[in-house]
From Swiss-Prot:
Gene Ontology CC terms, in alphabetical order: cytoplasm
Transmembrane recorded as keyword: no
Domains as described in the record: The N-terminal region contains the highly conserved SGGXDS motif, predicted to be a P-loop motif involved in ATP binding.
SUPFAM superfamilies recorded: Adenine nucleotide alpha hydrolases-like, MesJ substrate recognition domain-like, PheT/TilS domain
Family per similarity comment: Belongs to the tRNA(Ile)-lysidine synthase family.
Species, as recorded: Coxiella burnetii (strain RSA 493 / Nine Mile phase I)
PANTHER family reported in the protein's UniProt record: TRNA(ILE)-LYSIDINE SYNTHASE-RELATED
Record Pfam families: ATP_bind_3 (PF01171), TilS (PF09179), TilS_C (PF11734)
Superkingdom of this protein's organism: Bacteria
Protein's recorded name: tRNA(Ile)-lysidine synthase
Keyword Transferase included in the entry's annotation: no
Length: 449
């Protein structure tokens, strides 16, 4: 990002913004995240000039958090500026739900980006006005949290967002440069007085720490930005190494423990982070990651340990690591009537049963469906899978099928009266399976959305 601006001088102009944007994206539909502050106002103003010379579509999106008594005034200001510049304007209001210990900044940011993600259309680029100053602040915040190279990468210049993408074209421009542009063009922007409140960590860095660093090291913003770029490159290499390791140790969505144990502890931690990240879960802290290694990965081979953090559970079973949302409470006692004709929502987070008529597979359609019920394992059930000569306990069969212990009571069982006739996803019992030209109900579990 910094290299792109070398040789261009420090004065911000729409022409230099054009060079950024065309380097970062080939899209021609843009949506500006417009707060009304000086940074986003400069971006709106410069983009309006570029749109007069290029066949681009441009709109502005304002988020009204309602946290400040002046919030409605800021929204009106943004509306007026966009009307003057003939830019389509949209405002969205959010109500923040704060829990004890929540950071207002973090909750507001999450709500804001949820709206951005939903609002973007296909091939549309969201432009935000984050500057080199913002990048330095983010880097220092992550540093003081003990972040690794991924966190120290701070904000990427470009990433996917919803159906479109997010681009930050001002990451190598300082606020001072934007202020010069704003004053030269007689722009009027809003001032958020909460940006002066030192109780917020970012504000403390902005007003107390960085000015001291800048007096000693005038190029501190550019230097920190360069370090963030180095960290981003290192993080990419670590991700590539993890992907290479996952090719060898991941089967379906589980990790094979033996090949994982052959890696160095550093690569084990790297793989675990990537595995958890790719499943869309919150990454563990360093201490939690070490607990996962010690308590789950390195547990006795016949143990079935579980490690829980946030809303996540990591378990070990039959030489594999499993990752899932924390299991909800499950009542295994209900009998649910079902005639196969409609989908059947299962209790809790177990998903939905669906049945499709097919020839030669599934449960015979000639059965009396008025006697069909769906149940769950209580213990002591017996089953003779179709094609096998002997009856076995369901417990033994589930061990044979290598169903993890914590999932066994959650597998739907289909009964005809008091007779077990199918274990959904695993077998039809002898005498109840459709063969040849016979029609059958092919039953599957549809995971919860």
């Amino acid at each position: 990002m910094v290299e792109l601006w070398q040789g261009l001088g420090c004065v911000f102009t729409p022409e230099k913004l054009l060079k950024f944007i065309t380097t970062l994206t080939s899209n021609s539909n843009f949506c500006i995240a417009y707060s009304g502050g000086i940074d986003s106002h400069v971006l709106v103003h410069a983009m309006s000039h570029l749109c007069q010379e290029h066949p681009w579509q441009l709109r502005a999106l304002h988020i009204n958090h309602g946290l400040n008594p002046k919030a409605n005034d800021w929204e009106n200001h943004c509306q007026q500026i966009c009307n003057r510049l003939k830019i389509p304007f949209q405002s969205e209001r959010v109500t923040l739900s704060l829990q004890p210990g929540d950071s207002i900044e973090a909750v507001a940011r999450k709500a804001r980006y949820a709206i951005f993600q939903q609002a973007l259309s296909e091939n549309e680029t969201l432009l935000t006005a984050h500057t080199e100053n913002d990048q330095a602040e983010t880097f220092l915040l992550q540093l003081l949290r003990g972040a690794g190279v991924k966190g120290l990468s701070a904000m990427p210049a470009k990433r996917k967002l919803g159906k479109g993408e997010l681009v930050r074209p001002l990451l190598a421009i300082t606020r001072d440069d934007l202020k010069k542009y704003a004053e030269k063009n007689n722009l009027r922007w809003v001032e958020d007085d909460t940006n002066l409140e030192l109780r917020f960590n970012r504000n403390y860095l902005r007003h107390e720490v960085l000015p001291i660093l800048r007096r000693r090291w005038p190029e501190v913003f550019a230097v920190i930005s360069r370090s963030a770029n180095h960290c981003a490159e290192a993080a990419l290499l670590l991700d590539q190494l993890a992907e290479s390791d996952l090719q060898l140790i991941q089967k379906d969505s589980e990790l094979e423990i033996l090949p994982l144990l052959q890696l160095t502890p550093e690569r084990q931690r790297n793989v675990l982070r990537r595995w958890i990240y790719l499943h869309g879960f919150q990454l563990p802290q360093t201490k939690q990651l070490e607990q996962i290694r010690n308590d789950v990965l390195l547990a006795a081979h016949d143990a079935n340990p579980v490690f829980s953090y946030h809303t996540i559970e990591i378990r070990r079973h039959h030489g594999k690591l499993y990752l899932s949302n924390a299991l909800s409470a499950h009542n295994a006692t209900p009998l649910i009537s079902w005639n196969f004709s409609r989908s059947l929502p299962l209790p809790g987070d177990l998903g939905t049963l669906i049945a499709e008529k097919k020839k030669g597979v599934g449960i015979k359609t000639t059965l009396d469906t008025s006697k069909i019920t769906v149940r769950f394992r209580q213990g002591g059930e017996q089953c003779q899978p179709a094609g096998r000569k002997e009856t076995h306990t369901l417990k033994k069969l589930m061990q044979e099928w290598k169903i993890p212990v914590w999932q066994r009571d959650r597998v739907p069982l289909i009964y005809l009266g008091d007779k077990l006739i199918a274990v959904v996803g695993y077998c039809i019992c002898e005498g109840f399976e459709a063969k040849g030209e016979e029609w059958g109900w092919n039953v599957e579990v549809q995971p919860p959305k």
